[in-house]
Design a protein with these regions (language model features):
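Residues forming the flavin
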Residues: 1-419
Length: 419
């Protein structure tokens, strides 16, 4: 089915930033649409063990959603992906109405493609974790550390009884700490930083690197290069890989805006010249702290409200984790070839090296020669690694190499929805 909606402010994403923004705008009396692709409205708050004052982050999110649901001027759209930003403040959004039901209700469509007309919009789409490339990193049991943490905290599931974590930033240590607290054995945290923090009652190999994996039908062990030389085998059934977080800036590029480099998080942030009246807050803007996301979402919403004739009061926010993430950029283990960057299109480090050898060094040529980032995810986890490796091969800084931009739809969409 298809439909049309109008609002003052469209808020895209219902994590900490989106919820704070929606609460600010909703209390001010503006017509608000809050859209999120998940079936719960909390972003990563259900995936983390975060304290919001004297309550958990997940409880704060549930309390906030309950208040928003009680406001007649706020429309909450779960299971709704805002898939494109178009001219004149128009957005396309796909609502999955009955895909999740074993038996759809009579008269209900499978999906609805909404055309949303807005006066303003706020992108609070969060960030996507990226991997680190190493030899044979496609073996079952190797996954992103944030996903491993989500399984544990949100679903009470662990991929193995003994896990290891490979990281270049503090966030990887949080995965180990959360799993350890739930009784999962931690083989080790392998941190490429020589000054890696000691985060718990388990081994931390500072300055180490995972250089290979082994196992016939799944991961059985990893090979670790030690900082002082030599190698070591670690037995584990799963490996969480934490290479940093990329802001989900896709909608800011739908009017040809080009993402800009943010050295503090070693990732590309939102384009300065994005769609008209589209603001960005939270992790999508490069602020990876929870406190920063909360305040950023509330402040961006309040700023828009004041500019458009609404009276916005300052939102009282709970105390939350506010430390900036510490990261050392590390994209791929030296000397690896059979190391996957884009697992959907089977693009390896070797393919990027071959593209450089054949002089396909422009990011647009690299993309088309290797198909890096041309799968249905548009390179959400893979692009940064490939671009960083090409930058190293050409002797340039990553901002000089640049990045490709994104086009609608944000995620793969059923063709029939456009009919």
């Amino acid at each position: 089915d298809r439909g049309f909606l109008h609002c003052d402010l469209l808020i895209i994403g219902a994590g900490p930033a989106g919820l704070a923004a929606a609460l600010t705008a909703g209390r001010a009396g503006s017509q608000v649409i809050l859209a999120d692709e998940d079936f719960t409205l909390d972003g990563r708050l259900n995936s983390e063990q975060l304290a919001f004052g004297d309550q958990s982050g997940a409880d704060w999110a549930a309390q906030t959603v309950a208040e928003l649901a009680s406001l007649p001027n706020v429309r909450i759209m779960a299971r709704t992906t805002v898939l494109g930003a178009f001219d004149h403040g128009i957005f396309g959004a796909l609502e999955r109405v009955s895909d999740h039901l074993p038996q759809p209700a009579p008269g209900k469509p499978r999906q609805v493609l909404w055309r949303i007309y807005t006066k303003g919009s706020l992108l609070c789409a969060g960030a996507t974790e990226r991997p680190i490339a190493f030899e044979n990193n496609d073996r079952p049991g190797i996954m992103l550390a944030g996903a491993m943490r989500s399984y544990a905290n949100r679903w009470a599931v662990t991929p193995a009884q003994r896990v290891a974590v490979f990281t270049n930033n503090d966030d990887g240590h949080q995965t180990a700490a959360d799993l350890h607290a739930k009784g999962v054995a931690i083989a080790a945290v392998i941190d490429v930083r020589p000054d890696a923090p000691l985060s718990g009652d388990y081994e931390v190999i500072a300055g180490g690197q995972v250089i290979n994996s082994r196992g016939r039908l799944g991961l059985k062990s990893i090979e670790v290069a030690l900082p002082g030389g030599g190698k070591r085998q670690l037995s584990c059934g799963a490996l969480g890989v934490a290479g940093g977080w990329n802001p989900n800036v896709h909608l800011t590029s739908h009017h040809r805006g080009r993402p800009e480099w943010l050295p503090q998080i070693a990732a590309f942030g939102p384009a300065a010249e994005g769609p008209k009246a589209l603001r960005v807050a939270g992790a999508a803007k490069g602020d990876l702290s929870t406190a920063g996301a909360l305040r950023g979402g509330a402040d961006e919403a309040a700023s828009w409200l004041r500019e458009n004739g609404f009276r916005a009061s300052r939102l009282e926010l709970p105390e939350a984790e506010g430390a900036p993430i510490s990261i050392t950029p590390f994209w791929a283990v030296k000397g690896c070839n059979r190391a996957w960057l884009d697992q959907q299109n089977d693009v390896t480090v070797k393919d990027v090296k071959l593209a450089h050898q054949e002089n396909f060094v422009s990011v647009e040529h690299l993309k088309r020669y290797t198909t890096l980032g041309m799968a249905t995810d548009q390179g959400k986890t893979s692009n940064m690694g490939g671009l960083a490796i090409m930058a190293e091969l050409t002797g340039k800084a990553i901002p000089e190499v640049g990045t490709t931009i994104f086009r609608p739809p944000y995620t793969a969409t059923v063709i029939g929805a456009f009919g």
